[in-house]
């Protein structure tokens, strides 16, 4: 199945602790149906000291399930994603709310 949410997309969290927060997807894990969104679902992790890194407690992003996030449309509201095949045979993602193409 084609990916509805991809790296670089601006998304909004639909439910959970971070509901309503927006961020950019910087990693997608299709096998787990999860994505990492910058600044969303932050957790504290204990980092052991190494030669290159200092030890201590660091904050990092935890994966969010794809069903809990939606792409932000041009109007700033969450939208579902559909697909459209153009005349030249290329498949593009389309915002269901507005009908606008998401990627060119």
From Swiss-Prot:
Note the NCBIfam families from the entry: rplX_bact
How would you summarize the oligomeric state and partners of this protein? Part of the 50S ribosomal subunit.
Alphabetized Gene3D superfamilies for the sequence? 2.30.30.30
Q: Its Gene Ontology biological processes?
A: translation
Query: So what does this one do?
Result: One of two assembly initiator proteins, it binds directly to the 5'-end of the 23S rRNA, where it nucleates assembly of the 50S subunit. One of the proteins that surrounds the polypeptide exit tunnel on the outside of the subunit.
What protein name is recorded for this chain? Large ribosomal subunit protein uL24
Q: Name one GO cellular component term.
A: ribonucleoprotein complex
Query: Which GO MF term does the entry hold, naming one?
Result: structural constituent of ribosome
Originating organism: Nitrobacter hamburgensis (strain DSM 10229 / NCIMB 13809 / X14)
Q: Which cysteines bridge via disulfide bonds?
A: none
Q: What protein family does this chain belong to? A: Belongs to the universal ribosomal protein uL24 family.
Q: Give the matching PANTHER family.
A: MITOCHONDRIAL RIBOSOMAL PROTEIN L24
Q: What keywords are assigned to this protein?
A: Ribonucleoprotein, Ribosomal protein, RNA-binding, rRNA-binding
| Keyword RNA-binding assigned | yes
Q: Matching InterPro entries, A to Z?
A: KOW, Rib_uL2_dom2, Ribosomal_uL24, Ribosomal_uL24_CS, Ribosomal_uL24_KOW, Translation_prot_SH3-like_sf
């Amino acid at each position: 199945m084609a990916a509805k949410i991809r790296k670089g997309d601006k998304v909004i969290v639909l439910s959970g602790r971070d509901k309503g927060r927006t961020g950019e997807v910087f990693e997608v894990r299709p096998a787990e149906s999860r994505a990492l969104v910058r600044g969303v679902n932050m957790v504290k992790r204990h980092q052991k000291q190494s030669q290159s890194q200092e030890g201590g407690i660091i904050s990092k992003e935890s994966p969010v399930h794809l069903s809990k996030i939606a792409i932000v449309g041009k109007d700033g509201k969450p939208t579902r994603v559909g697909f459209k095949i153009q005349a030249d045979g290329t498949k593009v993602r389309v915002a269901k709310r507005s009908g606008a193409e998401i990627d060119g």
